[in-house]
Amino acid sequence: IMKFKKIAALLGAFTIASSLFIAGCGNTGSSQKTWRVGTDATYAPFGFKDKDSGKLAGFDVDIINAIAKEEGVEADVQNLNFDALLPALQSNTIDIAISDMTISEDRAKSVDFSKPYYIAGNGLVVNIDNTNINSFKDLEGKRIGVSIGSTGAEIASKIPNADVRQFNLIVDAFLELQNRGVDVVINDTPVNEYYVNSKGKGIAKVTGEDYDAAPLGIAVKKGNTELLNKVNDGLAKIKANGKYAEIYKKWFGKEPPAEDLK
């Protein structure tokens, strides 16, 4: 009886271990049923936590859910700080990152990007009573707030004599602006516009022309061609069947420009 119990216990342990191994393999194979997706939920309207439901919402969330549906899988969208997204891809903590992320040469060294799903420029946000900053040319020597690892941070690093202050969350940069701790925030224009018309209404304003517009992409781990192809396939399908335009209009209140539908 004792021998039988030992054998049964060993078989049980083996079964559990085998199940875990198979489940782990499923995260990268073609039989994968759920995509683990990371986004920074402080970049409204691209990603944010809905105050009523507590769930993640936004343009990026809807886009990746629509792509996943086309590919016959679920998208489990998780909230991560922006600067943690690429390390999470590299460590296999997540499969996909979508978070208002500009496709850049530097980022493309460590991850692979989908075809562009949005074209966005970077702009300036100042306090509503500010009259000294009207363009990027006025930023020399100014206190500039940016999000760590963002395109805004890269732009700010090139401004002469600027006091660049980096924040984990873009909402913290906006709060520091409100508290007069920085003179200006450099960030993606759609997020800036959403902020000054919501939480920053009557407090802050967008000023000046956009910095060069650049494409946003969906990132996967370097070399994960199978997943990248599925993301691109789903993206092409939602652009062709009208779902992309529907989501775009929902969050930006207008039809998408032709360049975003390519």
Language-model segment annotations:
Residues S31-D100, N241:
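Extracytoplasmic small-molecule ligand-binding "clamshell" domains
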Residues N27, T151-R165, I203-D210, L235-K262:
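Ligand-binding clefts/hinges and TM-proximal coupling segments of bilobed small-molecule sensing domains
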Residues V61, E74-D138, A204-K205, E209-D210:
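Acidic, polar ligand-binding/catalytic clefts
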Residues I1-W35, A258-K262:
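Short, low-complexity disordered leader/linker segments with a strong preference
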Residues V61-E70, N130, I148-S150, E193, ...:
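Extended ligand-binding regions for polar small-molecule ligands
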Residues S99-K109, I155-S157, Q178, D183-A213:
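A ligand-binding cleft/hinge motif common to bilobed small-molecule-binding domains
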Residues V61, D76-L89, T131, I148-T151, ...:
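Short helix-initiation/N-cap motifs at beta->coil->alpha
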Residues A41, I119-V126, E193-N232, K254-K262:
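Periplasmic-binding protein-like
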